[in-house]
Amino acid sequence: MANIRKTHPLLKIINGAFIDLPTPSNISVWWNFGSLLGLCLVTQILTGLFLAMHYTADISTAFSSVAHICRDVNYGWLIRNIHANGASFFFICLYLHVARGMYYGSYLQKETWNIGVILLLLTMMTAFVGYVLPWGQMSFWGATVITNLLSAFPYIGDTLVQWIWGGFSVDNATLTRFFAFHFLLPFVIAGASMIHLLFLHQTGSNNPTGLNSDADKVTFHPYFSYKDLLGFILMLVGLTSVALFSPNLLGDPDNFTPANPLVTPPHIKPEWYFLFAYAILRSIPNKLGGVLALLFSILVLMLVPMLHTSKQRGNTFRPLSQILFWALVADMLVLTWIGGQPVEHPFVLIGQAASTVYFALFLIALPLTGLLENKALNWN
C-alpha cells in the first residue's frame, strides 16, 4: 500500500513541497533564508496576535496600552521585544535572501522573482504601518512625513493624502486604519509566500554553480530539513538574545515620548532597515522626484532579469561582476549610514553620490560587465 503522505490530497501537497521535494545537492547556507523568512513570518504573526489582544488602537490609549503590555501582561515585555526585534531579523533575512538571488542569478526564474519583489514591498508596508501603532513621537512624525509624500502626485495628491489620513492630519482615524492594515497584511504576505513557493517548485531551486542540477538531486527531507533546522536555531538564539539583553538597541529613543503634534523631533528617521531608501528619497531636492526615486529603488529589482546580459547564470565564475555586486552591498551600507544622518554638508553630497552609484550599478554597470565578460570568453 502506498504511503499516506503520497496519496492523501492535502498531505501529498505538503510532501511535494517539504519532504520529497527534489533539491540540488550542492545548495549552500545562502539557500536557508527562504525557510528563515517563513519562521520570521510565523513568529511575527503569533507575537502580533498576542499583542493585539491587549493593544488599543486609539490615540488616547495606544501609548499607555503598550506600556501596560510591558508592565502588567504576563511576559508582555518579552512578546513585545520579540515582535519589535523580530521585524529587524525579518528584514536582515529578506535583504540577504534578495542578495543571494542577485548573486546567483536566481532572478531568471522571473515569476518567483517578481512575486518576491511584491512580497518585499508588502513587508515594507506592513512594517511601516506597524511602526505607527505605539503612537510615540517617531511613530507620529514618521507617519506624517511618509504619508505626506503622496501629496507630490500631481492633481490627486492632496486628496489622496487626506483620504489615507481620514481627515486633515494624522489622527485617530489614521491610527485605527493602520492597525487594521497591520493586522491584515501579514496574512496577505503568507498567501503571497505560498504563490512564491508554487512558482519556485514549477522550476526547482537554482544552485551555486548556476548549472542544471537535474542529474544530482536529493530529497529535501532529511538533508535540508535538518540544515534549515540549524538555521532556525541560530536565528532564534540571535533573536532571543537581542530581545532579552538589548531590546532597544535598534529602536529610536524618541518613541519613548508619547506623540505630540506640536513638537517636531530634531531628526525624523525611520527604522534602520528603511534608511537606505530614505537616503535615496532625501538625496533628490524635488518632492515628486524623491518619491519616484524611493519607489524605483525597490522596483529596480523587477528590471534585473531583463538587464541580465551574461551567458552565465550566477556570479560564481565572474570576478568582475562579483566586484560590482560587493560594490552594491557597500553602497547600500553607505546609504543606510547616510539615511540616519542629519541633512547637512557633507552628508547630503555623500547621499547623492551613493544614490547615483546605486542606480548606475543596477542599470548600467552590471549589464555592461555581463557583455564584457561574454566578449572576454569569446561567447558573443
UniProtKB/Swiss-Prot annotation:
Record Pfam families: Cytochrom_B_C, Cytochrome_B
Cellular component GO terms held in the UniProt record: mitochondrial inner membrane; respiratory chain complex III
Single biological process term from Gene Ontology: mitochondrial electron transport, ubiquinol to cytochrome c
Cofactor remark from the record: Binds 2 heme b groups non-covalently.
SUPFAM superfamilies: a domain/subunit of cytochrome bc1 complex (Ubiquinol-cytochrome c reductase) (SSF81648), Transmembrane di-heme cytochromes (SSF81342)
Binding site for a ubiquinone: H201
Membrane topology note: Multi-pass membrane protein
PROSITE patterns reported in the protein's UniProt record: CYTB_CTER (PS51003), CYTB_NTER (PS51002)
Keyword Plastid included in the entry's annotation: no
Cofactor: heme b
A molecular function (GO) term: ubiquinol-cytochrome-c reductase activity
Compartments where found: Mitochondrion inner membrane
Domain of life: Eukaryota
Binding site for heme b b562: H83, H182
Transmembrane segments: 33-53, 77-98, 113-133, 178-198, 226-246, 288-308, 320-340, 347-367
Entry keywords, A to Z: Electron transport, Heme, Iron, Membrane, Metal-binding, Mitochondrion, Mitochondrion inner membrane, Respiratory chain, Transmembrane, Transmembrane helix, Transport, Ubiquinone
Binding residue positions for heme b b566: H97, H196
Membership in a protein family: Belongs to the cytochrome b family.
SUBUNIT field: The cytochrome bc1 complex contains 3 respiratory subunits (MT-CYB, CYC1 and UQCRFS1), 2 core proteins (UQCRC1 and UQCRC2) and probably 6 low-molecular weight proteins.
Function text: Component of the ubiquinol-cytochrome c reductase complex (complex III or cytochrome b-c1 complex) that is part of the mitochondrial respiratory chain. The b-c1 complex mediates electron transfer from ubiquinol to cytochrome c. Contributes to the generation of a proton gradient across the mitochondrial membrane that is then used for ATP synthesis.
Protein name, per record: Cytochrome b
Taxonomic lineage from the root: Eukaryota, Metazoa, Chordata, Craniata, Vertebrata
